[in-house]
């Protein structure tokens, strides 16, 4: 009789171990991490030269984006 009780306990432990092993691991949310900010050095290095394509003034080395190109002067002929 004690063999059946021991067998039942072992089967239950085995089933619980399989359930724990098969459970998904919780993933760390990427929203909790702060994105790294660019240092002033890398911000300056990443700026685009005169004549490169741009979307706004902040992308150009001269801070002048005219007609989607980094410009040297404000007035365009």
From Swiss-Prot:
Compartments it resides in: Secreted
Signal peptide (UniProt feature, chain positions): 1-22
Pro-peptide positions on chain: 23-37
Disulfide linkage: 54-65, 60-70
One Pfam family it belongs to: LEAP-2
Entry keyword annotation includes Signal: yes
Annotated keywords: Antibiotic, Antimicrobial, Cleavage on pair of basic residues, Disulfide bond, Secreted, Signal
Entry's Gene Ontology cellular component terms: extracellular region
GO process annotations (BP): defense response to bacterium
Protein task: Has an antimicrobial activity.
Family classification: Belongs to the LEAP2 family.
Protein name: Liver-expressed antimicrobial peptide 2
Source organism: Sus scrofa (Pig)
